[in-house]
Amino acid sequence: MAQIAIYLGADRIISACGLTTRENMEAIGGGTPGVATFRDPSLCEGELTAGRVDRARFGHADFETLLEAAIGSVAAESGVDPKAPGTGLVIATTKGNIDCLRNAPKPDPRCFIAESAQRVAARLGFTARPVVISNACISGVAALVVARRMIEAGTCTEVIVAGADLLTEFVIAGFRSFKSVSETVCRPYDKARDGLSLGEGCGALLL
């Protein structure tokens, strides 16, 4: 496999800190937290302290919508043609559309991550079948490694890599069952730390 220089191109971050990469960096630089305490009976009982995408600004934020927004922005900003034979797409997630299982009488096809990824790719005009990486918390890094290897192998000339996960009833219940969710904003290196803060968001970039 050839050792060639591979560069990062356009990017977009959608999170509780902002809807663009610039907004996120400004929030981080200014010490503005994305984590807040709120109530949402559709997610869990009682209060939850977590990072949530601002629906008032973004609109309906589901797994596929977030991916389409981020990937579409990267393609538009970079000028990359999703239809070009050398353009690849790698999508990373831990749970994908797991919320589609809620109260479903039968499995929704979108519950299968590969199916959901293909729907996103088709709507954005990609001709290549998307590669899906779902390997817990390392999914995003693994997706970047896979994309780099696709370029080194000559399979693609450029690859858009995207990752997304949502705050869902399933995810929150899972972490709460481990007693690992902090009741306040997490303090990861504090002697009195009491857990983590969950969050949702989506990021995409071009290799």
Predicted regions and their residues:
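Short conserved active-site loop signatures built around small residues
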Residues: G140
